[in-house]
A protein has these predicted regions:
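Start-transfer (signal-anchor) and selected internal transmembrane alpha helices
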Residues: 1-23, 38-46, 240, 245, ...
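Hydrophobic alpha-helical membrane-insertion signals
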Residues: 3-94, 263-267, 511-514, 521-523, ...
Length: 780
């Protein structure tokens, strides 16, 4: 099979795998969304019991961030406007600049051109497909045989990191990691302009993905690989690679530059810097988290029906602890064999080890990461991306080299260790079953007997079976290893069995993590929402009390909140409404809100256009203009004078001001930002900050009505658009450059060919070992 036909065959197989994983949402009419978490609120619960459990209650961010932001971006772009400003959150906030809105993410084009919510599943599927196909190309470029490259390409989209973060912008950025290393290798070896341009496009795609921390991890991985190849790459190779990185950052300037300006106006950077421990402190390694790299559901999860033991044991949630999962067989068998191959595979193994040490807080790597500027304020738990990536690649290499287990004396002792662990796991399963009656009895005597009994019941139903399943898998692997070592199992059969065990393990883990819900559950109706549309229609605002209507929930229904569910917020609006929130260590509008806080901040809430507060508990008497109960929820209306309010919002205000015999100040209840501009009768005037928080324009006396226009037009966006255009032009020039156009002049660098001393696994009999038609690896 030619390389092109093999790539097409793999692309089809990968598409079938992704379709099997997400089939309910892609073809059966369901919606890939965790939006049923809204039923946990009294406002949406309806006739469901208070104990209603969503399909995956951990996945709240996609509902409160990415889905409403995607819909907002789509509506604005289809209306012919760049989504610069969002008036429906946080008294108005920058939208394009918040980074995670991912306005230019290539995957989101599916939603811009298609329909929602159907596009949500296709976006997720495209992320997985791109990640898998990129891994296949990288594995083929690095010389893996047919078994190895197919395994790597099919396993990576099923790994813990890609599956657990699938509905986050994290996955959009991470999907380009294999492509980045593939393009990096091409740039170091080919040293052509087109190689540099290809790398630039990949880097830009990752940056546009909407999670700059993950892209930083992608670029650091690329840089570490360059260090391992620095001698063979030469000056021209390094120049080609650096130029590609520079072009990529330049293309993504419209994503990166506004984010930088937004961070400068937000307290998040300072809060994270102060909350991080000293680089010299020695943290306690999160070794219990690391166990999830082998058994992701060891402590259960927040999926429906599963026990959630993580919090009680001090373990992080599933997304943070199990991101490095790549299959039990990959971890214990294939990856160790692959790491023994030396060369670049040893470098891949080092990347995985460093990622694990950083992700699980093991000194001295954890200390080093805290000492590096910028990296010190990123969430390095997400370095499990490196762990999963390395395990999958090494697993592919190990699958190709699986017969090497017959020659390694240590491998026999390693298999014995599997058997011991399998016995321990089986014993653990039996112990949990034996302790069942005692645990149930203790639960019934607990202060919260119903809740405790529910948790114990889940643990008894799930944990023994899960531990027993892991024990059976290890036992099966030990049996296969024994057959291989005795020569009773040939290479193809061994690869097929072990590869299938690993892929089935990954598929079983991944299936159902991202719920497919009924279409009616994606945007549930609520009499509370219907009433708010009457008493507080946009552009008026609402604030939720307690657990009701978390920030950004109302965006889903076209309403506005005075809070913002985002890690980056404007310091001005947070200071303005500081009295609303209960004290907390971080300055964020996700802090708890109580009725007492609403009373403290009532005057400023009114000045900000907040018309109502909603809570599941009854508000104190005498504090509000009117109070009504809608089902199980109370709606309190804030009385008093209202500010002038003008439409349409979202970065544009057009106002007709009545005549006035004296000068006056026009105040608009929207957060002040230096990017705002104003015109009175077509003449530009200064925009000022009222109380250091709200928009204000000073107007002279006038006998006639005046037209006032305000536009959000930050200069950094205009500058960065120009820079992105220049970057795209450079990339286009590189792609159309002649194939022989290389960086630098002068004599070519030294080239060394690695001799192939034994047949490469998967090579056809009589096929060439060199040149374009070679079936084996050619290292240059």
């Amino acid at each position: 099979m030619t390389p092109r036909r093999e790539a097409l065959a793999f692309a089809a197989a990968l598409g079938a795998l992704v379709s099997a994983l997400l089939g309910e949402s892609l073809t059966l009419g369901k919606v890939l969304s965790p939006a049923d978490v809204l039923y946990a609120q009294a406002s949406f619960r309806g006739d469901r019991p208070p104990t209603y459990e969503p399909a995956n209650r951990l996945l709240i961010d996609p509902v409160l961030q990415f889905q409403p932001w995607l819909e907002f971006s789509r509506r604005m772009l289809r209306g012919g406007r760049l989504p610069l400003w969002n008036s429906r959150a946080g008294l108005g906030v920058p939208h394009l600049a918040n980074g995670q809105s991912a306005v230019f993410d290539p995957f989101q084009i599916i939603a811009y051109l298609g329909t929602l919510p159907e596009a949500l599943a296709w976006i997720a599927a495209s992320r997985l497909w791109v990640a898998g196909f990129g891994m296949f190309l990288l594995a083929r470029r690095w010389g893996l045989g047919g078994w190895g490259r197919w395994f790597a390409g099919l396993a990576f989209p099923l790994c813990g990191f890609m599956v657990l973060w699938l509905q986050y912008t994290v996955a959009s950025a991470a999907a380009w990691l294999p492509w980045c290393l593939w393009a990096t290798d091409r740039a170091l070896i080919g040293r052509r302009w087109r190689d540099s341009a290809a790398l630039g496009l990949v880097v830009a795609a990752s940056l546009f993905g909407g999670h700059v921390q993950t892209t930083a991890h992608v670029l650091i991985a690329s840089g570490l690989y360059v260090l391992t190849q620095i001698r063979s790459a030469g000056r021209r190779g390094l120049t080609c690679w650096a130029a590609g990185i520079g072009v990529g950052v330049l293309i993504a300037a419209v994503e990166v530059v506004p984010l930088g300006f937004y961070l400068a106006k937000s307290p998040v950077w300072a809060d994270r810097s102060t909350s991080k421990p000293s680089a010299w402190s020695v943290p306690a390694p999160r070794l219990m988290d690391a166990a999830c790299t082998a058994l992701p559901y060891l402590y259960g999860s927040q999926r429906r029906g599963m026990p959630n033991l993580a919090r009680a044991l001090g373990v992080h949630n599933l997304n943070e602890s199990a991101g490095g999962f790549a299959g039990l067989a990959t971890l214990v068998w294939l990856a160790p064999i692959g790491a023994m191959s030396g060369g670049r595979w040893r470098a891949v193994a080092i990347l995985g080890v460093v990622g694990a040490l950083g992700a699980f807080g093991v000194p001295p790597v954890a200390n080093l990461l805290r000492a590096i500027p910028v990296v010190s304020v990123t969430d390095n738990r997400r370095l499990t991306l490196w762990v999963a990536f390395a395990l999958v690649l090494l697993g592919g290499r190990g699958l190709d080299q699986i017969m090497e287990t017959r020659r390694n004396q240590w491998f026999g002792r390693w298999v014995v260790a599997w058997v011991v662990v399998a016995v321990v796991l089986a014993g653990g399963a039996a112990t949990v079953v034996a302790l069942g009656p005692r645990l149930r009895e203790r639960a019934r005597s607990h202060e919260r007997a119903e809740s405790a009994s529910s948790h114990v019941g889940r643990a008894l139903r799930f944990t023994p079976g899960y531990l027993a399943g892991a024990a059976v898998q290890l036992g099966a692997l030990a049996a296969v290893a024994g057959l291989v070592r005795r020569g009773r199992l040939g290479p193809s059969a061994a690869r097929a069995i072990v590869g299938s065990i690993a892929l089935l393990d990954l598929f079983a883990f991944a299936y159902g993590v991202n719920p497919a819900i009924e279409r009616g559950d994606h945007r549930p109706g609520s009499p509370v929402i219907d009433r708010l549309r009457e008493v507080a229609p946009f552009p008026m605002r609402v604030v939720g009390v307690g657990a009701e209507l978390p920030p950004n929930t109302l965006m889903l229904y076209g309403l506005a909140d005075c809070r913002n569910y985002d890690s980056v917020e404007l310091a001005a609006s947070l200071r303005w409404l500081d009295a609303l929130y209960e004290p907390g260590s971080s300055r964020t509008s996700r802090r708890p809100v109580t009725w007492a806080g609403v009373a403290r901040a009532a005057d400023r809430l009114r000045a900000s256009g907040v018309a109502a507060a909603v809570g599941a508990s009854e508000p104190p008497a005498g504090l509000f203009e009117a109070v009504e109960r809608v089902g199980p929820v109370w709606i309190a209306r804030l009385g008093g004078p209202r500010p002038e309010r003008f439409g349409p919002g979202d970065g544009r205000f057009d106002v007709i001001v009545n005549p006035s015999a004296t000068p006056r100040r026009l105040v608009i209840p929207e957060t002040y930002d230096p990017g705002w501009r104003a015109w009175v009768e077509g003449v530009e005037v200064a925009v000022k900050a009222e109380s250091a928080a709200l928009l204000a324009v000073d107007l002279p006396a006038a006998d006639l009505p005046r037209w006032v226009a305000l536009r959000y037009d930050p200069p950094e966006v205009r500058w960065s658009l120009v820079a992105s255009g220049v970057g795209l032009c450079l990339a286009a020039l590189g792609l159309i450059a002649p194939k022989k156009a290389v960086f630098g002049v002068g004599a070519a660098g030294r080239v060394g060919l690695e001799s192939i001393l034994r047949p490469t696994p998967g090579r056809r009999a009589g096929s060439p070992t060199e040149g374009r038609d070679a079936d084996g690896p050619l290292h240059v």
